[in-house]
Amino acid sequence: MLDPKYLRSDIAEAAARLATRGYVLDVAAVNALEEKRKDLQSRTQELQAERNARSKSIGEAARRGEDVAPLKAEVTKINEELETSKVELDALLAELKVIADAIPNLPSDTTPVGRDENDNVEVRRWGTPREFSFPVRDHIDLGEAAKGVDFKNGVKLSGSRFVVMKGQIARLHRALAQFMLDLHTLQHGYTECYVPYLVNPDSLYGTGQLPKFSQDLFNTGIDGEGEEEGKVRKFSLIPTSEVPLTNMARDEIFDEQELPIKMTAHSPCFRSEAGSYGRDTRGLIRMHQFDKVEMVQLVHPEKSWEALEEMAGHAEKVLQLLELPYRVMALSTGDMGFCAAKTYDLEVWLPAQNTYREISSVSNCTDFQARRMQARVRIDGKPQLLHTLNGSGLAVGRTLVAVIENYQQEDGRIAIPAALQSYMGGLTHIG
């Protein structure tokens, strides 16, 4: 959520910056609602002051032995007007909140301006794509040949965009997640967390999935136990462990010396993939359920840009140790996620597709999520909004795809990257 004070004082500037994201802010409509809010708020305060003054007069008149019935009648009338004014004000504030909740974060000054992914800017590359002396096979063919990727049973058990992994492919998938966690916790300073896979609406609001992106979620329709009577709180499956990790800061005030807080978690992620019809219908690239190792940082508001570069480096280190060629892209304003002020995508080379594909997104959300969550840090004795960052470190399934395709051998076997062999019991090849 953007700063309401900024929207009120610099709405034209905000609208111009949001327009680079393809978001049209109706300035005239917002200004009209704001004027109405100020009038209603002023009227409500005047009525409260008038009621308090009249109520005080009743006590004074009673002490003098005067008839207080006329004054009580006036107070009753004022209370009726006040109640009407409060109802109108609450309705107007709710309308303004609906608008505010739908406004994305402001792009940073260093975010490339563009309409979509075609306007993303390459920042750097690492590694050289391997030249094969034999016809390249894709991960589906290789995985099925190794009897480790079973889409048929995935469809039978659940439907399209699900898979069953078996044998050494399943083991390799597990090894990748363990390797990533060990790297981030032992070398990069993150604390490993095991988090709930079911979260409440407050959590999804805090990290920006609700209310705008409800169609992307899998909702259980089940209430949590012990909730307040009359308050419906449905559980949803997490689309990423960013949601529970970041929301642990909700309604908290940290001391300055506690920051940065760096957390990581390995979890399944559940996404409806609404709007992805016809895209990546084969293989492991776009699934309803996939595993990811997530990184989250809660930082001092003056240090988030430094933290963004650091987090991108942490994700890159995974690919470097696996010796997988990749490139780093700065996303354009039109391609960024809702909460991000700036995002780097890491794209890994997939030989069978002869292109780079996204394997990680690392974003600085500045104070956007923190404002929704009221996550703060005490600086010079005064609570201020902290900054939140999140990034994939990495998407495990897509990393598996990259390893299978980049490490394929002419005889159909899959070589195990040196960094993973200790996690595979010394195994050097699959197949």
From Swiss-Prot:
> What are the annotated GO cellular component locations?
cytoplasm
Q: Where does L-serine bind?
A: 240-242, 294, 392
What InterPro entries does its record include? aa-tRNA-synt_IIb (IPR002314), aa-tRNA-synth_II (IPR006195), aa-tRNA-synth_II/BPL/LPL (IPR045864), Ser-tRNA-ligase_type_1 (IPR002317), Ser-tRNA-synth_1_N (IPR015866), SerRS_1_N_sf (IPR042103), SerRS_core (IPR033729), tRNA-bd_arm (IPR010978)
Binding positions for ATP per the UniProt entry: 271-273, 358-361
Q: Which GO terms describe its molecular function?
A: ATP binding; serine-tRNA ligase activity
Please name the pathway. Aminoacyl-tRNA biosynthesis; selenocysteinyl-tRNA(Sec) biosynthesis; L-seryl-tRNA(Sec) from L-serine and tRNA(Sec): step 1/1
What residue spans carry the region label Disordered? 41-66
Specify the superkingdom: Bacteria
Q: Which UniProt keywords apply?
A: Aminoacyl-tRNA synthetase, ATP-binding, Cytoplasm, Ligase, Nucleotide-binding, Protein biosynthesis
Instruction: Establish whether keyword Chloroplast is in the entry.
Output: no
What Enzyme Commission number does this protein have? 6.1.1.11
Location (main, coarse): cytoplasm
User: What is said about the domains?
Assistant: Consists of two distinct domains, a catalytic core and a N-terminal extension that is involved in tRNA binding.
Q: What does this protein do?
A: Catalyzes the attachment of serine to tRNA(Ser). Is also able to aminoacylate tRNA(Sec) with serine, to form the misacylated tRNA L-seryl-tRNA(Sec), which will be further converted into selenocysteinyl-tRNA(Sec).
Protein name as annotated: Serine--tRNA ligase
Organism the protein comes from: Aeromonas hydrophila subsp. hydrophila (strain ATCC 7966 / DSM 30187 / BCRC 13018 / CCUG 14551 / JCM 1027 / KCTC 2358 / NCIMB 9240 / NCTC 8049)
